[in-house]
Amino acid sequence: MSLLSFLIGEKKSTASVAKERLQIILAHERSGRNASRPDYLPALQRELLAVISKYVSIEPGDIKVHLERQDNLEVLEVKIELPDVQR
């Protein structure tokens, strides 16, 4: 980089600007600050259904997984509707 280009400033191409912006967006999403529903929640819900189905007959809609975030606190809420057991 020459002294002249340093003083005047280099004109960045739109491709490099777009690349930098995408990198910032990806880093932001990977940090988890912007994700309201992480990628692992659907897989977690499927695995819970598979394990519980070994013991009790339930439908996919009977399991609800919800993640709530506030500041530095994360709460994972899992609601499972089990069928009535007749004795």
Curated annotation (Swiss-Prot):
<comment type="similarity">
    <text>Belongs to the MinE family.</text>
</comment>
<dbReference type="Pfam" id="PF03776">
    <property type="entry name" value="MinE"/>
</dbReference>
<keyword id="KW-0131">Cell cycle</keyword>
<comment type="function">
    <text>Prevents the cell division inhibition by proteins MinC and MinD at internal division sites while permitting inhibition at polar sites. This ensures cell division at the proper site by restricting the formation of a division septum at the midpoint of the long axis of the cell.</text>
</comment>
<dbReference type="InterPro" id="IPR036707">
    <property type="entry name" value="MinE_sf"/>
</dbReference>
<dbReference type="GO" id="GO:0032955">
    <property type="term" value="P:regulation of division septum assembly"/>
</dbReference>
<keyword id="KW-0132">Cell division</keyword>
<protein>
    <recommendedName>
        <fullName>Cell division topological specificity factor</fullName>
    </recommendedName>
</protein>
<dbReference type="GO" id="GO:0051301">
    <property type="term" value="P:cell division"/>
</dbReference>
<dbReference type="InterPro" id="IPR005527">
    <property type="entry name" value="MinE"/>
</dbReference>
